[in-house]
Amino acid sequence: MATVKLRKALRMKGEKMKTDSRSLVLQGYVWLMMPALLFLLFWFRWEVALPVAALMVWSFVRLCRPSARESLQTEGYSPVSASRKRLLLMAAAVVAYVMVCGIGGFVTQLPNDHAWRNGVFFDLSRRDWPVAYEGDGAPMLCYYFAFWLPSAVVAKATGLIAAGDAAQVLYAAWGTWIALCFISSMSGGRMLWRVFLVFIGFNAMDVVTAFFFSDESFSVFEDPWAAQLMWLSTTSGRFAASANPVIYNFIYNQGIAVWVFMSLLMHGRRDTGRLMLLFGMLPAFAPIPALAVAPWVAWRLLRGFRQALTVENVAGLLFALLTSFFLLQNNSGSALRRAYPDTPVGEALLLAAAYYALSFGAFVIFIWRYVRRDGLYWSLVAMCVAVSLVGVGKTPDLAWRISLPAVVMTAALVCRRAAETAAMSRGVRCAFVAVLLVGSFSSVWSVVFTLHEESCVWRGERERKYLSMLGRIADPSQPYYNNFVATGDSFYRRHLAPPDIRSRE
């Protein structure tokens, strides 16, 4: 009897665990919908929030029904299969990567965006929702903060910011895991370490674009710990195509959501019956990247208009409209302008086309088989070029953020190609590896920089976590005040905000 049990245990240990694409789709929708529902229920009047929330929940219930199973299985996607040991090791590696990028503040945070991210999370955790402040113009927190809402609930429930920080790590790791599993699913279902390494190291050739487009000068030999060496993707003024570590270090509140969204979109792009539900949740996390996808989504919905008339799409449209009314009151977000007005439009577009050709061109050679007739991919690249003419507030943030969907889709397809290296000829494989290594310079450097900064923490030379903005988000003297607050009257305050917000202003 004992021998039989031992054999059974050994068989179970060697068994592979499988996850089909339906499970991944449901996980992706839960990941996006949890913060969306929290935002809806606490930032809007009950008579507005409850009907839309009910529609969104009903849409998810319809998604879970057995009758929807076939529509969630997409050709070209295989069940993800790996041993329990490999899955656990890769899950641990994902958590470690998220922590090394500074999310949660358990490993050294790099300068200096984390200071404001920590400040937003602190106010969401410590103040009543919607977050309002005292001061002229009745300021209130107005930012795309959906990423932090589940973690803020944990912090509120426990009374511990540290518990919320741990929840941030787990939520970020879960979103990353969903994206990696989708990549594995479209790569034959194999969970490969080389795919994971390409994922964390992907960089859109910023070492090349910085050489041609940046006015700054930096050298690894002159100042090896200059922060610009990992920020190369943001040193070219109006243009940017971020590295994945830059996304995870500085704009993770948007970037991880874009990874989950793009994974779902690439998988279910032909399903117009749920397209607006999926797209409608993105602006609460990442409104600027959502603009990059909007033209393609609009085209697909118009093309399949009859199939698009669904409860799911109505729910997504209503949620997107409510999110837009909230975000449009932001002091910076409502101020669009022409970026670099002294440059003629034609010249600016040529420069943008050259920049993004350098950013993505070397990778497109290897993923050409996937993208040559892919309207989604080329529309995302075209939006990168076109929106380089536009700025928001005082910074070129619109152009910097709008490239995220193109970067993410390129990275996902490059990861898929990395899973096929065994089928490449030796010459193609060597060229592919060379392109990845050249592109990964600042990605590798950001990890090296983090380890250096962590050693500084141990020596007592700096703090691990940026705390300078805790409780100061609504301080008008801080330089990015307008990015995070809304003041004065607005359509949202008059008609959509909960009535009790006036008593807290």
Predicted feature locations:
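Membrane-embedded alpha-helical segments of multi-pass membrane proteins
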Residues: 47-59, 170-174, 239-247, 251-261, ...
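Transmembrane alpha-helical segments
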Residues: 56-64, 175-186, 257-269, 294-302, ...
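Transmembrane helical bundles and short interhelical boundary loops of multi-pass, membrane-embedded
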Residues: 38, 317-505
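Transmembrane signal-anchor helices characteristic of membrane glycosylation enzymes that use polyprenol
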Residues: 38-44, 58-62, 84-112, 172-180, ...
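Active-site lumenal/periplasmic loops and adjacent helix-entry segments of GT-C-fold
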Residues: 101-260
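Membrane-embedded, hydrophobic transmembrane alpha-helices
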Residues: 2-84
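Membrane-interface alpha helices of multi-pass inner-membrane proteins
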Residues: 34-40, 245-246, 264-265, 272-295
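Membrane-interfacial loop-to-transmembrane alpha-helix junctions, especially the N-terminal start
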Residues: 18-30, 78-89, 192, 271-275, ...
